[in-house]
Amino acid sequence: STPLYSSAASDVYKRQVIDYKSGVKKFKLSDILDGLNLQMFVYLFALCDDKNAALNGVPAGVLYMHAARNILNFNSPIEAKNNLENKKESRFKMNGIVLSDNDNAIAKAMEHELEGKYIPVSASVKGVKGDLITLEQLGLLHKKINSLVKKMGNELQNGVIERAPIKNSTHLNTCDYCDYSDICANTKAIYNKIGANLKDEQVIESLHKEFENDAGMDNTTE
């Protein structure tokens, strides 16, 4: 967790969780609807919800960074000379979501010039764009993740552990990495094909509909 930023008018810190990955991680907000990629968000909301903890604060997003050392390939010495620095920098670009706030202060605290070199947010004459999320939208994610974790816990307690590996555009070979594949004896004909590959705005719209009658945002507002 990183204490990113504290406004002059408040002692409330904005908190992010950054996951350093040995492999390439492609984050999709729509995965949350299917109960995937919850881990870093669970950490984030747990930190921010604990009012007695030194690390509490307002959630400011989740980012994934490829931390492995890559070999840079070039077709010629001239190409290497012209593109070496850009390729070096591109290795450290993170993906995920960043909290959108007034004047984009949080994004600027991470990358001052907002060129989109290191975070999935960039600025131009037309404004700031990228993988941004509002505090209210993070509140909807909080509600959804709480609901999913509660459902998972109840199912485990009741012995519901079905053989239903997932399969979508980012999870093609789930069984290849499963420690229980030998005893499961799955023929790979049994797959829980999930994910409509929704755009971020469609995910938020879906969450609004799901929780439109709920009051409050699970303490994710300042």
Describe each PLM feature range:
Residues 23-35:
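Short helix/strand-bridging catalytic loops that position acidic/His residues to coordinate divalent metals
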Residues 38-46:
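Short amphipathic alpha-helical face segments that pack within enzyme cores
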Residues 7, 15-24:
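Active-site ExK catalytic segment of metal-dependent nucleases
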Residues 5, 36-39:
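Short, conserved glycine- and acidic-residue-centered signature motifs
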Residues 1-9, 13:
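Single conserved hydrophobic/aromatic residue that forms the stacking wall/gate
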Residues 22, 44, 54:
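Cation-handling catalytic/transport regions enriched in His/Asp/Glu
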Residues 48-180, 185-188, 192-194, 198-222:
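Metal-dependent nuclease catalytic regions and adjoining charged, substrate-binding loops involved
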